[in-house]
């Protein structure tokens, strides 16, 4: 059963867990705990989750007959910070290399991190590529262009919140 994928979805009103078999796409286990808590009150969150997760993890591990070691964590939090950024790079009729795009995105990531030191970037979404003023539907690697605009969205959460969740799950020997 090493082909299992485990998802935890946290919202202020519930915790949902789903375990799926990657090879067959079958649901192995689905459960929902109705809980009402403030995801921004870290002390209360820690107390509630430590208690609730212990029972849930035991139930899950009994169902899948193996320890739960790694999960995919989805979080719905009102304090999620979404940062939309666009950057224009002049290529002067040069070919776009994969390393060019990686460098541009890494540079944006560093700027977002530097200007938001209390936040952790959880997702980076490339929203759009604009090549010589025209939108393109694929990564423009290998294209020759005058300029390239990349529109990127960074989804961030508080470092304190992420550290709190990591510690809670670490207490149960689970990583995300």
What is each PLM-predicted segment?
Residues 1-14, 18, 22-70, 75-176:
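Nucleotide/phosphate-binding catalytic cleft detector across ATP-hydrolyzing
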């Amino acid at each position: 059963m090493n082909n299992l994928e485990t998802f935890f979805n946290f919202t202020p009103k519930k915790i949902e867990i789903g375990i799926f078999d990657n090879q067959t796409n079958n649901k192995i286990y689905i459960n929902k705990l109705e809980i009402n808590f403030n995801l921004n009150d870290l002390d209360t969150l820690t107390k509630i989750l430590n208690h609730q997760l212990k029972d849930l993890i035991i139930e899950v591990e009994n169902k899948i007959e193996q320890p739960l070691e790694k999960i995919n964590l989805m979080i719905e939090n009102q304090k999620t910070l979404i940062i939309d950024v666009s950057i224009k790079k002049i290529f002067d009729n040069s070919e776009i290399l994969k390393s060019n795009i990686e460098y541009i995105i890494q540079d944006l990531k560093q700027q977002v991190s530097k200007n938001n030191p209390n936040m952790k970037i959880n997702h980076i979404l490339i929203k759009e590529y604009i090549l010589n003023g025209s939108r393109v539907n694929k990564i423009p690697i290998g294209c020759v262009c005058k300029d390239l605009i990349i529109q990127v969205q960074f989804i961030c959460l508080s470092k304190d919140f992420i550290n709190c969740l990591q510690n809670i799950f670490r207490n149960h020997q689970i990583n995300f």
